[in-house]
């Protein structure tokens, strides 16, 4: 397996991994302890990704070499992630419990990978929840309280949860009126809920609604769709830091 294929071609995942973590870090007090935790978080994601690809390909591929290509990256990333995780947890044992909370969601993602249904709506939502939960973890590590992190974590969940149906309307389900209507309806509700969390979030979530309503069907290239989501993710990070 070439080195370039060690990193998954899932650009949206990186924003989902980074934005809640960075929001939690800067809503609290950034510390050196955040660095090994961030490394453990990203390496853990890479390890799980390759493990799930091995699981999927072991079942569906007729080429025995296909699943084997993911074994080495899974072990390398997993070992490195575990090392950084233990480094983080040694002075903060509660991080082990926080990590365990992600287990049910990883199990759901693994079941969908085994069934070769990774593009399922529920599978996407199951991936979003622990990613947004990292805001709580990073905030607590920086001296903040769990309670202070609930509203900003919900804001992240509202946005990244909405990207699951929205991106489908731009690519795989671009011809589905049902997905389009569902995505727009979700974003309408998200604007209201976000505004209830804090009025500061009304403007960015109104923009997210407009992009969900206006961009599908315009034939945008995948790269453009990704660039728009990067900008939206950065806007979310800025809004959360200002609002909370």
Q: Could you tell me what each predicted segment is?
A:
Residues 82-87, 93, 99-138:
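Intramembrane alpha-helical segments
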Residues 1-14, 60-70, 109-129, 170-184, ...:
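Interhelical loop and helix-boundary elements at the membrane-water interface
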Residues 22-38, 83-97, 133-153, 192-201, ...:
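Helix-coil boundary and interhelical linker segments in multi-pass alpha-helical membrane proteins
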Residues 1-92:
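N-terminal topogenic module of multi-pass integral membrane proteins
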Residues 148-195:
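A mid-sequence, solvent-exposed acidic-amphipathic segment
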Residues 34-45, 95-105, 149-159, 200-212:
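Hydrophobic core segments of alpha-helical transmembrane domains in multi-pass membrane proteins
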Residues 190-244:
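C-terminal transmembrane-bundle signature of multipass membrane proteins
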Residues 18-20, 68-81, 125-139, 180-193, ...:
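Small-residue-rich segments of transmembrane alpha-helices in multi-pass membrane proteins
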């Amino acid at each position: 397996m070439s080195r370039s294929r060690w990193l998954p071609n899932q650009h949206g995942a990186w924003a989902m991994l980074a934005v809640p973590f960075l929001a939690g870090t800067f809503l609290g007090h950034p510390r050196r302890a955040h660095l090994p935790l961030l490394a453990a978080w990203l390496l853990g994601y890479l390890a799980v990704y390759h493990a799930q690809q091995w699981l999927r390909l072991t079942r569906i591929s007729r080429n025995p070499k296909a699943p084997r290509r993911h074994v080495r990256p899974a072990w390398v990333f997993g070992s490195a992630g575990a090392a950084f995780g233990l480094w983080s947890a040694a002075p903060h044992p509660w991080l082990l419990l926080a990590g365990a909370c992600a287990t049910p969601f990883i199990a759901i993602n693994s079941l969908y990978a085994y069934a070769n249904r990774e593009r399922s709506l529920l599978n996407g939502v199951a991936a979003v929840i622990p990613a947004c939960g990292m805001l709580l973890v990073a905030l607590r590590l920086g001296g903040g309280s769990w309670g202070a992190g609930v509203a900003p974590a919900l804001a992240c969940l509202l946005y990244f949860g909405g990207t699951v149906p929205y991106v489908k309307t731009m690519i795989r389900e671009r011809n589905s009126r049902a997905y389009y209507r569902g995505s727009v309806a979700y974003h309408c509700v998200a604007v209201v809920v976000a505004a209830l969390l804090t009025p500061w979030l009304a403007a960015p979530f109104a923009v997210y609604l407009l992009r969900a309503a206006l961009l599908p069907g315009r034939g945008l290239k995948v790269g453009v769709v990704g660039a728009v989501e990067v900008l939206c993710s950065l806007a979310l990070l800025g809004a959360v830091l200002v609002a909370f």
